């Protein structure tokens, strides 16, 4: 709905060159939140605490939608651990959001796979709503890079693997560094 409204506004803008500053400000206000990451609150497996996106608005956030049964998701973990180790103290938070696993399944998984960043879960209705709010996650893994003030800066709709796709990995690192410097 917002996208259609956005295009309507842009079309109107292009057809009319007589907009004053007040009208331009109204258009900007209406369209500002189109690329905002939707707020959520999910539980952390390891810390047994809650994570809310809006509380982290002064951080750069990498949200990785994944599942324990997903092979490429498992392959990303070491690279994300490295990114977390390198950039967490500089303001990057990585959140692994499980799209289908229970807390018990995740605890069992974490006994085998070392994940240094927070792994989040929620009941399936909450997760499904989050996936919908983020425009639908059509494949996993899917990763969202979110800048300060919760603006979505980049979406990676596949595995980000340093070894197998160094260009995508370099793009991610480049964008993280830019966002951290803002």
Outline where the language-model segments fall.
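Rossmann-like NAD(H)/NADP(H) cofactor-binding core
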Residues: 63, 95, 120
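Thiol/disulfide oxidoreductase modules built on the thioredoxin-like
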Residues: 112-115, 122-175
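Structural microenvironment flanking redox-active thiols in thiol-disulfide oxidoreductases
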Residues: 75-114, 124-131
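Alpha/beta-hydrolase fold active-site loops
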Residues: 60-61, 141
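Active-site acidic short loop of glycosyltransferases
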Residues: 56-59, 89, 115-116
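N-terminal "domain-start" segment that seeds a small globular fold
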Residues: 19-53
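Conserved redox-active cysteine motifs that mediate thiol-disulfide chemistry
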Residues: 57, 65-82
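Sec-dependent N-terminal signal peptides
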Residues: 4-13
């Amino acid at each position: 709905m917002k996208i259609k409204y956005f295009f309507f506004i842009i079309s109107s803008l292009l057809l009319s060159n007589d907009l004053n500053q007040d009208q331009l400000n109204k258009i900007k206000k209406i369209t500002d939140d189109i690329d905002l990451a939707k707020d959520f609150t999910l539980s952390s497996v390891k810390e047994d605490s809650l994570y809310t996106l809006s509380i982290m608005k002064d951080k750069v956030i990498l949200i990785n939608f994944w599942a324990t049964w997903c092979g490429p998701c498992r392959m990303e973990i070491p690279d994300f651990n490295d990114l977390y180790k390198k950039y967490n103290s500089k303001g990057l938070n990585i959140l692994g959001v499980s799209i289908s696993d229970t807390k018990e399944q995740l605890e069992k998984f974490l006994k085998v796979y070392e994940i240094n960043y927070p792994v989040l879960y929620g009941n399936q209705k909450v997760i499904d709503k989050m996936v919908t709010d983020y425009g639908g996650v059509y494949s996993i893994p899917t990763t969202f890079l979110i800048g300060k003030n919760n603006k979505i800066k980049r979406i990676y709709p596949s595995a980000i693997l340093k070894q197998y796709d160094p260009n995508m990995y370099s793009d991610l690192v480049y964008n993280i560094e830019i966002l951290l410097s803002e």
